[in-house]
């Protein structure tokens, strides 16, 4: 597993580790993968392309892993793939901008278009939204999400009234908040990574905007919601494939096993946790597909794009697990307002 142990995406690491270890324990209890026991090797990707490349290269050449599961920002994903050099498949788990992530890679996360089109249409219909503003970090995912948001707004009959992209780690939001104040949007779409999203949402509420503007956060989950200050979640929405309050499609049993296994010592199970759990099962399915536990052969199997539908079929789950759920924050929980088929 290659995860960010610190930095903006570090807040997801514990939940992802917990879910992956649970999946590995389940498979090992039932005989492993083609008779071989799963051993999880963890490494920190860091937050630069150089560190992500080095981490992946170490897993492939020194640890001799058969597969890699990763949750990284989109700007680090190519570095991980290059570091693996086709020696092991790369299962990329988070919400991302969409598209093929390259030979040897399988994607399990939902995409911006799957989230934005139905969610913004719902905002227009049910919240009478007409004016939309976009805020994001300045890297590949939000840049692509900006264009996807523009298209989704036009499809929904709304008006795009402004945008702002900020570097990682920026905490001075005065200029961006002034732009939002001047633009007077009904909805602000936020595509920021991990802790950056938490900090911006907090500043947004402190500026008094949350009473009159709706926020739609992309790639935002219960871990981030819990990190917000009291009173900072008014009119805050998020869209994910899973929320802990919206269990179903046999995820109830998974959540119960997760809770029982860790007895509250791990964060609430989130969409990122679930996708890391599924990724372990996908690696097992890839080994079954090629007939042996062999990283090169499994990576070669993924040279053409493997659709998410096909990935779910291989692990014996319905693609209904990838349904998009639009939820509104109520305290430290999300309450689902609408579910859409991805």
Spans of features found by a protein language model:
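Extracytosolic ligand-binding ectodomains
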Residues: 1-342
């Amino acid at each position: 597993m290659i995860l960010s142990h610190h930095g903006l995406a570090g807040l997801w690491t514990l939940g992802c580790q917990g879910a992956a270890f649970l999946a590995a324990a389940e498979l090992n209890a039932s005989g492993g993968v083609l008779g071989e026991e799963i051993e999880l090797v963890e490494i920190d990707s860091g937050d630069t392309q150089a560190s992500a490349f080095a981490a992946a290269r170490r897993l492939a050449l020194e640890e001799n892993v058969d597969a890699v599961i990763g949750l990284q920002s989109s700007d680090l994903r190519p570095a991980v793939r290059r570091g693996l050099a086709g020696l092991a498949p790369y299962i990329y788990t988070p919400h991302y901008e969409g598209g093929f992530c390259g030979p040897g890679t399988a994607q399990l996360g939902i995409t911006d278009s799957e989230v934005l089109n139905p969610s913004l249409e719902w905002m227009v219909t049910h919240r009478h939204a007409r004016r939309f503003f976009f805020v994001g970090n300045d890297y590949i995912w939000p840049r692509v999400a900006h264009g996807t948001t523009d298209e989704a707004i036009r499809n929904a009959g709304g008006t795009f009234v402004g945008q702002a992209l900020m570097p990682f780690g920026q905490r001075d939001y005065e200029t961006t908040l002034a732009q939002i104040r001047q633009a007077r949007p009904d909805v602000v779409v936020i595509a920021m990574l991990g802790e950056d999203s938490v900090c911006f949402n907090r500043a947004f509420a402190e500026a008094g905007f949350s009473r009159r503007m709706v926020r739609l956060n992309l790639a935002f989950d219960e871990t981030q919601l819990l990190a917000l200050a009291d009173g900072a979640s008014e009119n805050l929405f998020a869209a994910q494939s899973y929320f802990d309050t919206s269990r179903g499609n046999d995820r109830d049993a998974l959540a119960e096993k997760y809770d029982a296994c860790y007895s509250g010592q791990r964060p609430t199970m989130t969409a990122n946790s679930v996708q890391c759990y599924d990724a372990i099962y996908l690696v097992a399915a890839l080994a079954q597909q090629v007939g042996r536990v062999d990283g090169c052969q499994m990576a070669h199997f993924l040279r053409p794009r493997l659709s998410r539908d096909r990935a779910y079929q291989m692990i014996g789950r319905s693609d209904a697990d990838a349904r998009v759920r639009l939820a509104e924050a109520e305290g430290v929980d999300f309450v689902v307002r609408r579910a859409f088929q991805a």
